[in-house]
Amino acid sequence: MSTIQIRRSDDSDVVSAANDYHSNMAIQEITVAELHEILPNIVLVDVRETDEYVSGHVPGAVSIPLSTVQDNIEPFLAHKPTYVICLGGARSYRACEFAEQNGAECINIAGGTGAWIQSGFDVVLGELPNS
């Protein structure tokens, strides 16, 4: 009877592979100060919900709530790169991950609209999405 030897990787191999995968999938980010410098010459998508968008958004931002990104991927694909913002950076990061998995090139805005407002930059109030 023959025996089969199974080699088990130690945990460091698994952690290293996971880190390599994550670093290859990392989403690019810029600060709100960097965003301020390049506006209005970019496409900026705000993935907050409509009521959040209407309560104050970065001038020129287009509203595509995160809950609808899957059905509205075209704007992400039409412009390379597409800049994506939310309130703090987490939802926009998720939107970027989804869009990039579908062929888009996205840049997340670190700190989001909250950091934009804290920096004292102008916001647009009360405007309907995409108007």
Map each language-model feature to its residues.
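Short, surface-exposed ligand- or partner-binding patches at beta-edge/loop junctions that are enriched
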Residues: 84-85
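Rhodanese-like catalytic fold shared by cysteine-dependent sulfurtransferases
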Residues: 2-43, 49-81, 91-131
